[in-house]
Design a protein with these regions (language model features):
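Catalytic/RNA-binding core of pseudouridine synthases
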Residues: 1-133, 137
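Positively charged, low-complexity/disordered segments
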Residues: 139-141
Length: 141
């Protein structure tokens, strides 16, 4: 493999690692193995620390291909816990509400899950890693 010229690699990101942790550790080990001070390494999409799954990592000139991978169709598999909420919508923050779930049937859950199939336009929550550019127009004087 020619990591300096560019390679596309697939990693299974471990639980509790950030995407940055994975890239940083790989970059460190790779630069030591190749005996170079600096090597270009990037990833094609962030996974939350509490998510595990495939991360596409590119090296060298292959980092120019990141956009090709970043916006491809993705599949998510989730385990959920009904009846509890957190401010971050995941387990990174403490549970802030507990609600009864006895009335919820399997059929209702399966019906709701169908709304998550296909192309979905999402509004990222406040705790999202999504970068948003804010523009404020000058106010008239």
């Amino acid at each position: 493999m020619d990591f300096i010229a560019g390679e596309v690699l697939y990693f299974n990101k471990p639980l509790k690692w950030t995407s940055f942790d994975l890239v940083n550790k790989f970059r460190y080990k790779l630069s030591r193995k190749l005996k170079v001070k600096k090597i270009k390494v990037g990833h094609a999409g962030t996974l939350d620390p509490l998510a595990t799954g495939v991360m596409i990592v590119c090296t060298g000139k292959a980092t120019k291909r990141i956009d090709e991978f970043q916006y491809q169709t993705k599949e998510y598999v989730a385990t959920l816990k009904l009846g509890e909420t957190t401010p971050s919508f995941d387990l990174e923050k403490e549970i802030d509400g507990v609600y009864p779930t006895e009335h919820i049937t399997r059929e209702e859950v399966e019906k709701v899950l169908q709304s998550f199939v296909g192309t979905i336009q999402q509004i990222p929550p406040v705790f999202s890693a999504c970068n948003c550019l804010l523009y404020t127009s000058p106010s008239p004087r």
